[in-house]
Amino acid sequence: MKKGFRGTGTVERVDFPNKGIAVTDDGDRVIVKNTIPGQKVEFVVNKVKHQRAEGRLMEVIEKSPLETEEPCPHFGICGGCTYQTVPYEKQLDMKLTQVKKLISDAIGTEKESGYEFIGIHGSPKKSEYRNKMEFSFGDEYKDGPLALGMHKRGSFYDLVTVTDCQIVDEDFRTILKATLDYFSKNNIPYFHRATHKGYLRHLLVRKATKTGEIIVDLVTSTQTEGFNEEELLAGFRYALLTRQYDGRFKGVLHTKNDSVADVVKNEGTEVLYGDSYFYEELLGLKFKITPFSFFQTNSLGAEVLYETAREFILGDDKDSLNGKTVYDLYSGTGTIAQLMAPVCKEVVGVEIVEEAVCAAKENAALNGLDNCKFIAGDVLKVLDEIEEKPDYIILDPPRDGIHPKAIGKIIEYGVENMVYISCKPTSLARDLQIFMDRGYRVEKICCVDMFPNTYHIETIVALHRTDL
């Protein structure tokens, strides 16, 4: 099969991350992304490597027997959701199957390696679950009217205005509509990615699930030719605050970003209304969150994730960490560290993002926890500098997993038990092989779905040292 070949096939399975395996009438297999098992699809081969063909999805000729009608009018055009036409229980089955295959391919099956795969915990909310969205300004087609929303599937430039997005609640949709209406009426240009000219770039919206507090951050360039920026922003603030919401506004912000890269970057933020932060609650703890703070995007799902992790860590003995030191590596804003602090002597968190470390320290103080210590720096380097030795290690690395040299240093501590929380099962499978080669065995695994209607999945693994 050569590059440029156009063909059809039936998707027999989907591997993580979202790689459909389509089988042609001749028995050839082609990887086609954004597909669902059972679909008959048309594809064009765009890559052939090591006799493995990859194709671009052109059309779904026949729906899968798994599919129902899509609840979102933007589905298939918007690049956000992939599994929205699949009933939620079937989504969970698909994700569990994908993770099980990756893990068994890497370290063997449950029977071969002696671990227990507990299953998968679903998200408490299947729709309207996100507490954060980053919308982009642009157009839906070249020289078209102003759009505000998500990138179209497979496009770096074209957008779809997601006024009926189903993974956020009505307050997000109201804010999007109010913002788009206001800047469209005032003929304000968006920042063109090709020419680097224009004003409007992104709209960052965050809403706490538990407290209902809302914060909005408008991200723009500093190119203000043709209008009075102060008057424009005052009108924007008024357009937002005069709408009706279920939650309540905590702050309206304006961030400047002249970077040519199409990412939200903070080069200076001013408060247009209220405060530059809001509060969210998880499992009885309170967290102060700024527009650019890392925080799990599904608050209720995060509670399931962290409660499951805590059960893995403590097991049946709730006093097992009394008097002991816990390392929380890749600690982010310190959520897990603060959940474990009440049941151990000390938690030491290490995180490379300084702003996240500052937030972790502030939140620990907010929750009255004086036995949390947070250090800013690369885990690989910081481990050489910490005097306290751990009795237990919690790992929650970014998507790329743990650097092999860092794994080596972690293993050298020789702790009896560890828990690894992963947001990318391919990275997890690779890292587990290293741990097992160096004297650890996998005891149990559980998946937690934080992202309904997408292919993303969290996985928690308990590791036990075998050569003690």
Question: Where would I find each of the regions flagged by the language model?
Answer:
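Rossmann-like S-adenosyl-L-methionine
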Residues: 1-7, 13-17, 222-468
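Structural signature of eukaryotic scaffold interfaces centered on beta-propeller domains
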Residues: 206-208
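Short, conserved phosphate/pyrophosphate- and ester-handling motifs at nucleotide-, phospho-/glycolipid
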Residues: 38, 168, 298
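Short, acidic/hydrophobic/Gly-rich beta-strand patch recurrent on exposed beta strands
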Residues: 20-25, 149-152, 217-219, 360
